[in-house]
Amino acid sequence: MRILTFLLGLKTLWVLAFSSLSNTIAVNNSGKWWGIVNVASAGNVLPGSDARPVPLVLDPSLQLLSRQKRLIRQNPGILQSITRGLHSAIRECKWHFRNRRWNCPTGTGNQVFGKIINRGCRETAFVFAITSAGVTHSVARSCSEGSIESCSCDYRRRGPGGPDWHWGGCSDNIEFGRFIGREFVDSSERGRDLKYLVNLHNNQAGRLTVLTEMRQECKCHGMSGSCSLRTCWMRLPPFRSVGDALKDRFDGASKVTYSNNGSNRWGSRSDPPHLEPENPTHALPSSQDLVYFEKSPNFCSPSEKNGTPGTTGRICNSTSLGLDGCELLCCGRGYRSLAEKVTERCHCTFNWCCHVTCLNCTSSQIVHECL
């Protein structure tokens, strides 16, 4: 009996070690491509000489995978588009979380969002979804603007669309955007564990959100603006709309667990591993829901493990009962009030023709800072 117990213990340790290694592999690859936001520019793509053409050379500091490099070489202009999309995602993340304990801090280097990407919490889910959405949105827009040589407007919609309108114009190329988003972003995921499935799900949720937020725009034709006939096309939403939708899904994110129907094997085509809600009474998450598998840290104190700075020194709202209020944002530690001088433009006048002149007015305001 003791021998059996000992062997079972060894098996458990081996499984845990293998799982830990799998997680490490996934962590080492996840989000590496985000580093392009700090180094990507036109100078990172170097063409060969006219006398002896050679393949494009990418700056090694980008630390991209072979598939990602191939996509960049095959689609001139796409590196800049992906970089713009990542910048948009970072701005959107900081905007939506500006008043929360975790305010989407970013830094230099390859791990732009820090060690939070190694976790499996709600914040991690939002980061993966918004960055995937940013790439999809930016690439789709770049196609219709002619910034990427290998794609253009989406001309699949043609002909009559209804009794008084027809498809035409230049629809944003959402399908090419989703293709690049999937091939470029998802290729950085490695492993066969829960984190791998969760990251892929949230990447897909980000791309689908861009698709579902697209809207039809039309232009009227007819005598004296009668609008007897319209030409319509599909237009990408403002990226703020995408961020709003993903923030709503962050608030309603589903906690999930890994399921392979009790099998110890990775799975087969007929029975692949999948995500299930941790609470069996909850519905399965949809393809657009954000998912996570561990509770978020409280983000109150600096954490080397999570790479988060804590909330000391953050400006809070002393009259708010919400997340930006001093009681919640400062985690009960209290706050200090400081007088701060603010200089603003004032007493502006319009001068013919054509400029505006203003004075600089200085005032004092009280700000509250977490201890």
Curated annotation (Swiss-Prot):
Glycosylation sites: 28, 261, 317, 360
Modification comment: Palmitoleoylation is required for efficient binding to frizzled receptors. Palmitoleoylation is necessary for proper trafficking to cell surface. Depalmitoleoylated by NOTUM, leading to inhibit Wnt signaling pathway.
Subcellular location: Secreted, Extracellular space, Extracellular matrix; Secreted
Low complexity bias locations: 261-270
Disulfide bonds: 93-104, 143-151, 153-170, 218-232, 220-227, 300-331, 316-326, 330-370, 346-361, 348-358, 353-354
UniProt-listed GO biological process terms: canonical Wnt signaling pathway; cell fate commitment; forebrain anterior/posterior pattern specification; negative regulation of DNA-templated transcription; neural crest cell fate specification; neuron differentiation
Keyword Lipoprotein applies: yes
PROSITE patterns from the UniProt entry: WNT1
Pfam families reported in the protein's UniProt record: wnt
Signal peptide positions on this chain: 1-19
Tissue spec. comment: At neurula in anterior neural fold; at tailbud in dorsal midline of midbrain.
SMART domains from the UniProt entry: WNT1
UniProt superkingdom: Eukaryota
Lipidation (O-palmitoleoyl serine): 224
Single GO term (MF): cytokine activity
Keyword annotations from UniProtKB, A to Z: Developmental protein, Disulfide bond, Extracellular matrix, Glycoprotein, Lipoprotein, Secreted, Signal, Wnt signaling pathway
Residue ranges, annotated region (Disordered): 261-281
GO cellular component, one term: extracellular space
Keyword Secreted: yes
Role description: Ligand for members of the frizzled family of seven transmembrane receptors. Acts in the canonical Wnt signaling pathway by promoting beta-catenin-dependent transcriptional activation. Plays an important role in patterning during embryonic development. Plays an essential role in the development of the embryonic brain and central nervous system (CNS). Has a role in osteoblast function, bone development and bone homeostasis.
Family as reported in the entry's similarity comment: Belongs to the Wnt family.
Name of the protein in its database record: Protein Wnt-1
Gene: wnt1
